[in-house]
Swiss-Prot record:
InterPro entries: Ribosomal_uL15 (IPR030878), Ribosomal_uL15/eL18 (IPR021131), Ribosomal_uL15/eL18_sf (IPR036227), Ribosomal_uL15_bac-type (IPR005749), Ribosomal_uL15_CS (IPR001196). Residues 1-18 have a biased composition (Basic and acidic residues). This is Large ribosomal subunit protein uL15. GO terms for cellular component: cytosolic large ribosomal subunit. Belongs to the universal ribosomal protein uL15 family. The keyword Metal-binding does not apply. Residues 42-52 have a biased composition (Gly residues). Transmembrane segments: none annotated. Keywords: Ribonucleoprotein, Ribosomal protein, RNA-binding, rRNA-binding. Part of the 50S ribosomal subunit. It comes from the Bacteria. Pfam families: Ribosomal_L27A. GO terms for molecular function: rRNA binding; structural constituent of ribosome.
C-alpha cells in the first residue's frame, strides 16, 4: 500500500447535490422547496421566534430582573490556592496574575475561604470573605484591603 493508493471507505463520501439542474436529477423545477409560498421565495422564511402571528412565547412571558450597570465582577481566589506561595510572601493581585493563579482580572480580586491555608502570608486584595480573613490571621498572616 502506498500513499497514492489510499481511497476513502466506500460510502463515506458523496457528491454535492446540485439542485435546479433538470427533472432527471430528482431536484429540478422547485429544487426541493415545494410550491410557492413564503419559504419558496429567495430570501424567504420567517424570523426566529415567529409563531405565525400568534403572540410568541418570549412576549407571553413576563420580564424578570434587571442588569445592574454598576455591578463589579471580582476574580475569585480560594485559600488553598494561596498555599503555592512561600512563607512571608506578600500576595498582591499583580503576583496572582503573574503566577497565573488568576485568569483574567476584572474589577479586582476577592479571597474566599475554601480550603486551608498553612502559610504565613501578607495578602492584599480588594475583598475578603469574613471566614477567609479569620483563617489568614489564624495562620499568622495579615490581611490588607486595597
Amino acid at each position: 500500500m502506498k500513499l497514492h493508493e489510499l481511497k476513502p471507505a466506500a460510502g463515506s463520501r458523496s457528491e454535492r447535490n446540485r439542485v435546479g439542474r433538470g427533472m432527471s436529477s430528482g431536484n429540478g423545477k422547485t429544487s426541493g422547496r415545494g410550491h410557492k409560498g413564503q419559504k419558496a421565495r429567495s430570501g424567504g422564511g420567517v424570523r426566529p421566534g415567529f409563531e405565525g402571528g400568534q403572540n410568541p412565547l418570549f412576549r407571553r412571558l413576563p420580564k424578570r430582573g434587571f442588569n445592574n450597570p454598576t455591578r463589579k465582577e471580582f476574580a475569585v481566589i480560594n485559600l488553598d490556592t494561596l498555599n503555592r506561595f512561600e512563607d512571608g510572601t506578600e500576595v498582591t493581585p499583580e503576583l496572582l496574575i503573574e503566577t497565573r493563579a488568576v485568569k483574567g482580572m476584572k474589577d479586582g480580586v476577592k479571597i474566599l475561604s475554601n480550603g486551608k491555608i498553612e502559610k504565613k502570608l501578607t495578602v492584599k486584595a480588594h475583598k475578603f470573605s469574613e471566614a477567609a480573613k479569620q483563617a489568614i490571621e489564624a495562620a499568622g498572616g495579615t490581611v490588607e484591603v486595597i
